[in-house]
From Swiss-Prot:
Record has Disulfide bond as a keyword: yes
Modification 4-carboxyglutamate occurs at: 60, 63
The name this protein goes by in its record: Turripeptide Gsg9.1
Stretch forming the signal peptide: 1-23
UniProt keywords, alphabetically: Disulfide bond, Gamma-carboxyglutamic acid, Hydroxylation, Secreted, Signal, Toxin
Provenance organism: Gemmula sogodensis
């Protein structure tokens, strides 16, 4: 079982090296940078919703619903944090 896992890990490692060697390194690097930025944004996420969320109903706008940290007001349907 451990040998299969090691073979799988090594295969993925060598395929990633080959991807870089085949001239796709630039694309691979850009994908890695984008993933790094996304993770950075998730770690340092804003605590307040964007200003326009005060005028939108949370449940109808996915981005506002995401930033609505205190939840949606059940009476108005808008963010309680704004």
């Amino acid at each position: 079982m451990m040998a299969k896992l090691m073979i799988t890990v090594m295969t993925v490692f060598f395929l990633s090296l080959q991807q870089g060697a085949d001239g796709l390194f630039e694309r691979w690097r850009k994908n890695q940078m984008a993933a790094s930025r996304i993770m950075g944004n998730l770690i340092t996420a804003r605590l307040d919703p964007p200003g326009y969320c005060t005028h939108k109903i949370c449940y109808e706008d996915g981005e506002c619903n995401q930033w609505c940290t205190a939840g949606c007001n059940p009476d108005t349907g808008k963010c309680d944090t704004t």
